[in-house]
Amino acid sequence: MALNLEKKQEIIKAFATKENDTGSCEVQVALLNERIKLLTEHLKANPKDHSSRLGLLKLVAQRRNLLKYIKRTAHARYVVLIEKLGIKDR
């Protein structure tokens, strides 16, 4: 269910703004996006898992808030990020 270390490091490397960057908004959004994908697949197989559904909703809200922050502070970075992740602009 959780991201394995190799996948996580791959995502961090792809979205880091500088070397050893693990906490920037872009990296956080990319990691959340991957966790959301994994949880979505889990919920397709287990539709009655309501605690996981609640966790998914929390992750989506967290990603949405981070995306709003990036859009407000650095719109160019926001556009690049949503294109890379394949997320729709709201």
From Swiss-Prot:
PROSITE patterns: RIBOSOMAL_S15
Function: One of the primary rRNA binding proteins, it binds directly to 16S rRNA where it helps nucleate assembly of the platform of the 30S subunit by binding and bridging several RNA helices of the 16S rRNA.
Organism of origin: Helicobacter pylori (strain G27)
SUPFAM superfamilies, A to Z: S15/NS1 RNA-binding domain
Protein name (Swiss-Prot/TrEMBL): Small ribosomal subunit protein uS15
Record note on quaternary structure: Part of the 30S ribosomal subunit. Forms a bridge to the 50S subunit in the 70S ribosome, contacting the 23S rRNA.
Family of the protein in this entry: Belongs to the universal ribosomal protein uS15 family.
InterPro entries: Ribosomal_uS15 (IPR000589), Ribosomal_uS15_bac-type (IPR005290), uS15_NS1_RNA-bd_sf (IPR009068)
PANTHER family: RIBOSOMAL PROTEIN S15, BACTERIAL AND ORGANELLAR (PTHR23321), SMALL RIBOSOMAL SUBUNIT PROTEIN US15M (PTHR23321:SF26)
